[in-house]
Amino acid sequence: MNGFACSFPLPLAGLPLASPLPIPSLGVLRLLLFRSRRQAKLHICAGKLDSHQCQAGVVINQTPAEDQVSNNALTTGGAYGFEGATTSLTNELMPSSKRVTLIRHGLSTWNEQSRVQGSSNLSILTETGIKQAERCRNSLVNMTFDACFSSPISRAKSTAEILWQGKQEPLIFLDSLKEAHLFFLEGMTNADAKKQYPELYTSWREDPANFHVAGIYPIRKLWGTAREAWKEILLTPGENFLVVTHKSILRALICTALGLTPERFRAIDVNNGGISVFKFSKQGEAMLQCLNMTAHMYSDHIYNY
């Protein structure tokens, strides 16, 4: 049957002995096997479970015991509370699971002027960008963070200072959170860059993974930088972290956490002031909980996650 093995007994009761045994089709067998596996993961909920009323009547994939999770350290797919996660970003067991909140800096002068920013330190927050940073801070008023990491580049640094205002712990600046270096394109308007360097600009916009100058591939390099940043962040003592940085490195952070390659760079978009949230198992494996939340930009929304 095309190599498909049936791992459960076929129903024989009620079949005449003289009749040949009907052989289910491959599609039927797959459906039966799917249902069998699904039923093994489902537990009918009667009344209450752990003092929480079961809304849908079904409990799916109950949380495994802590010692069971620890036995899966450093293995892909052994993450806490979910299956088939990504490869460990720490390569070592952490003392606890962690949550990381990622925020892109507020609107900057070069954002407003449609200029290529890159790693330049000349672009600063606008008045709108300052208000966006304040909105981010207000939206997270119910959240507690053990540390805040930031790019040292001015637009991200200013955003982090607003977010971390009134905290006793100092901000932690990481060079691994700096934006990608885009060489002589930095500071140019997008229109001028497209006009003066059409092939290079087209490569940057349409095939960023293969965009290169003098043999240097900024986006491919950014993937290594992002992995370095994750390791620095996750191995810091604490359980809840805030990270403030730039669009390109945020894309790399999100993609590397999800196991995506540089070719997927533009598959992720993050707005100014956009908030994304990851949960990490003890094994350093990531689960994306929220991506580019912006409700706080248009209302007084307060997050609880």
Task: For every predicted segment, state its role.
Residues 286-305:
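Acidic, His/Gly-rich catalytic cores of divalent-metal-dependent hydrolytic chemistry
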Residues 88-90, 262-266, 302-305:
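Short, P/G- and charge-enriched loop/turn segments at secondary-structure junctions
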Residues 110, 120-124, 163-228, 287:
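Phosphate-handling substructures
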Residues 97-106:
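Short, hydrophobic/glycine-enriched beta-strand segments
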Residues 106, 151-153, 176, 244-248, ...:
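Short, well-ordered beta-to-alpha junction loops that form the rim of enzyme active sites
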